[in-house]
């Protein structure tokens, strides 16, 4: 029961909060009580599903409880089983990497089926991590010969020549999140050897200009901070037998005022083009601390209110 209830009963406390029920353990049996019969039935169904996953060796945590409740409310609880059937990749320590939400599963499927995939969504949805996992899997299966990871160094204005140190020292602060994910999947020593052989390349976006990248799995991270010109330049680097994943969060644009995000434009321009997928993740796909999900929802609601207020003010001026 400890694995089901979680540390300090956090899993069951969260289930109580989400479904407005009371859960207790009496004589070795789990008892669910509440004012709503539907809520009680839902909580019981979620608990049965979580227990079945535990019996299969899966780990139950608060992130999984949130996903299970969300699926239960949509009448899709049984789809939770399929999330654990597909191992995206394996870390160098042998831990399987799986999708944790339906949105993540659709994102991974889109990457598999398309040459170019845009992963759009807030922080904590696994956009970059899952793209990295897919890249490593493609490299191990010899579908590609190398991995190219890049992101715009917007904080430095891409004028890296003014910073002290060699190229690696200049760009490392901007590329550290990509290194972290790569180290977890391949191990630091393996990554270093692969970089020395050119199998893995990590570089700022400015260094992609003038190149054609063939037989490669290419990831552009933090793409909301590309300009329109940079995005077009990057997308036209694609060579034969390559796959590109572009990730970003349009709500976190750090470009100078007046500069339009290349990611925002690309999603509009390329929507509907064959072999290009645009996969949007939401707060429901956030798999970090539950407070992150609440923060994302709050900011989304604030942005919506601001948009409505702006629209109302503009309509008033027109009148």
Question: What is each residue range found by the language model?
Answer:
Residues 29, 92-104, 110-220, 224-319:
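Conserved helicase motor core of SF1/SF2 NTP-dependent helicases
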Residues 4, 46, 68-72, 83, ...:
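Residues that form generic nucleotide/phosphate-binding pockets
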Residues 74-99, 104-105:
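P-loop NTP-binding catalytic core
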Residues 4, 42-43, 231-234:
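Hydrophobic side chains in well-ordered alpha-helices
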């Amino acid at each position: 029961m400890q694995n089901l209830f979680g540390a300090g009963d956090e899993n069951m406390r969260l289930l109580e909060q989400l479904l407005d029920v009371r859960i207790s353990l009496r004589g070795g049996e789990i008892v669910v009580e509440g004012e709503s019969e539907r809520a009680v039935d839902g909580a019981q169904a979620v608990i049965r599903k979580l227990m079945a996953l535990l019996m299969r060796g899966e780990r139950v945590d608060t992130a999984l409880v949130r996903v299970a409740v969300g699926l239960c409310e949509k009448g899709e609880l049984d789809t939770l089983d399929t999330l654990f059937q597909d191992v995206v990749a394996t870390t160098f320590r042998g831990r399987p990497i799986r999708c944790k939400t339906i949105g993540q599963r659709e994102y991974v499927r889109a990457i598999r089926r398309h040459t170019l995939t845009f992963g759009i969504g807030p922080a904590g949805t696994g956009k970059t991590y899952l793209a990295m996992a897919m890249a490593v899997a493609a490299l191990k299966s010899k579908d590609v010969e190398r991995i190219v990871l890049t992101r715009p160094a917007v904080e430095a204005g891409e004028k890296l020549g003014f910073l002290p140190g060699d190229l690696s020292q200049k760009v490392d602060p901007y590329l550290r999140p990509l290194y972290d994910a790569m180290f977890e999947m391949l191990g630091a020593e393996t990554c270093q050897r692969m970089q020395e052989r050119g199998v893995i390349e990590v570089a700022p976006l400015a260094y992609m200009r003038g190149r054609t990248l063939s037989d490669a799995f290419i990831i552009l991270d933090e793409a909301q901070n590309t300009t329109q010109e940079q995005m077009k330049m990057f997308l036209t680097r694609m060579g034969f037998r390559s796959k590109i994943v572009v990730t970003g969060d349009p709500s976190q644009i750090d470009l100078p005022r007046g500069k339009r995000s290349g990611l925002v434009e690309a999603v509009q321009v390329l929507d509907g083009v064959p072999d290009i997928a645009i996969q949007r993740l939401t707060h429901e796909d956030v798999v970090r601390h539950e407070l992150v999900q609440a923060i994302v929802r709050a900011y989304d609601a604030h942005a919506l209110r601001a948009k409505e207020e702006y629209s109302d003010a503009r309509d008033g001026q027109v009148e």
